[in-house]
Amino acid sequence: MEEFQRYLQLDRSQQHDFLYPLIFQEYIYALAHDHGLNRSILLKNTGSDNKSSLLIVKRLIIRMYQQNHLIIPVNDSNQNQLFGRNKNLYSQMISEGFAVIVEIPFSLRLIASLAGKEIVKSHNLRSIHSIFPFFENNFSHLNYVLDMLIPHPVHLEILVQTLRYWVKDASSLHLLRFFLYEYRNWNSLITPKKPSSSFSKKNQRLFFFLYNAHVCEYESIFVFLCNQSSYLRSTSSEAFLERIYFYGKIECLVEVFAKVFPVNLWLFKDPNMHYVRYQGKSIMASKGTSLLMNKWKYYLINFWQCHFYLWSHPGRIYINQLSNHSFDFMGYFSSVRLNPSMVRSQMLENSFLIDNAIKKFDTIVPIIPLIGSLAKAKFCNVLGYPISKPVRADLSDSDIIDRFGRICRNFSHYHSGSSKKKSLYRIKYILRLSCARTLARKHKSSVRFFLKRLGSELLEEFFMAEEQVLPLTFPRVSSTFQGLYRGRVWYLDIFCINDLANHE
């Protein structure tokens, strides 16, 4: 963002209204390829000899100044051969540069909001692990959860209409329409595991930006409506006692009105609604009843249809009780379970045993989906039996061990918040034995021989994962096996979900 502020010496109104001329600036394409202001080589194409250098960027800008060169007829035999051969390359470059340009208004709003709230270190807020401490603090007091998938637009014009509220430049919107109708692969970009064309693989930044803008517009309206419908707003710690007394008044009102107005009881209850989203999946949890959650379910369906013309099937929204069901979110199976405890109370010569049950938020590693992900990556079969992976002959044994160990450390780092570490131990066992089978396949030897020769080294590589990432949190723990049974630890440096853990 510093590069934007350095080069874009325009006030905010100009940046909102005149974004299209920036498509003719060379530094935009340098920023699009994350090379800062390095003007040497911007992109290596997956083709045979195509390289997008500064010369190609200048050639592209010259052609864009000419008329009718952005839209090329398919059956035009008189078109320039060089432009026809590089049509996909030019289109890719323009779309990536355009993605950088349309992100400018959103980036400026983000900087202004962070400066207004005096948030100096905002990187910790980006960690996806910061969601789980929020779950621990709030979900143990809630009853029901809505597990839903956010629908995506079925018509590309809806994306353009949504972006009109943020980008006021008509020329930029017309260019956006050109890309959207030129490459009709929106559904494949929502699920990037099944890309339908090479363009979708290389130009996901633009389509991810459009999807995030669509979700941002939906959430801004949705949060506003939730705040308007909530009777009890979140208060600061100074008014905490007043809120406790108000809860007591609510319970008294419920007892009074229970006999006369049983239908309107839910109006006096604080719904205490919480909303969390990651990618296309969102969670809504409430302290209310199942009737209230059903009302929210059909309200969301009507909200998507009326305001955004999106059809969402009721079967895509599940209502589960937290005490009886677990929900799959960000690679964890999360639930609220009762932790029974017995307390002995003694008064004078009499003693009493009091059964007490405390709600506790529980997170476990889903072993079956993880084994399925490892099977797709060819680390094991569908039953979890480790197999060897084909590797290049020029890789050394230390490189192979380091690659397997890095994967194992990433697993341990991401799933450090699991309540039960035995599933994580099984994943490590699969990776360790798969590494041994890979080495044995390379040297055309037996697995027992390599386990006997490299047993201690493999053991240190695969079981020292927590010791390397937790040296300050648990300095007294020395045994490598004790790391498998530690408590939950959440990190603030994880910005994306593990690829093998993203089994949804």
Curated annotation (Swiss-Prot):
InterPro entries: Domain_X, Maturase_MatK, Maturase_MatK_N. It is found in: Plastid, Chloroplast. One of its GO terms (molecular function) is RNA binding. One of its GO terms (cellular component) is chloroplast. GO terms for biological process: mRNA processing; RNA splicing; tRNA processing. Keywords: Chloroplast, mRNA processing, Plastid, RNA-binding, tRNA processing. Pfam families: Intron_maturas2, MatK_N. Usually encoded in the trnK tRNA gene intron. Probably assists in splicing its own and other chloroplast group II introns. Belongs to the intron maturase 2 family. MatK subfamily. PANTHER family: MATURASE K (PTHR34811:SF1). This is Maturase K. The gene is matK.
